[in-house]
């Protein structure tokens, strides 16, 4: 099923698989979202939950409050990006997707949760709202959440990657940890100014 929001400026499509964006086209038909060429990266815009990035050996070790010496296996970027979400169209400019913890997720991440993702289309802007609802009464749940959209670059055949740049409205003063792309792990002690 094609899930779509459309206005005069953009046509945006979504997938129940991962509750994610699958296409962003302007009024001229230019595709802005990466279309998942597996030669480079098969993803498009996965939702990352309950982790962003990687864990050493994919192991999540939970404290005694959860289960004594319990270890779960959480792959890079979490448990939901390759799961089917329930879809609900709210109105002509808003769709939502929902995923509820199940037997499979509870084996690796011992928390009951509902993850709602709400997408809104306004002019040439798409906003994403994440809602993590805990069903846990006695404890809070640890998590990270994030979006990982891939964008086409270059957009036109006569352009090259080097024609593009990012411009920030403010000078950036943070430092970033050294990363190891093969594992997705970070060295928090070795930082580079950004």
Residues of each region from the PLM?
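Broad, structure-driven detector of short, well-ordered beta-strand segments within folded domains
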Residues: 11-14, 117-119, 166
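Active-site/ligand-binding surface loops and adjacent short beta/alpha elements
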Residues: 140, 150-194
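Extended, loop-rich substrate-binding clefts of extracytoplasmic carbohydrate-active enzymes
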Residues: 70-123
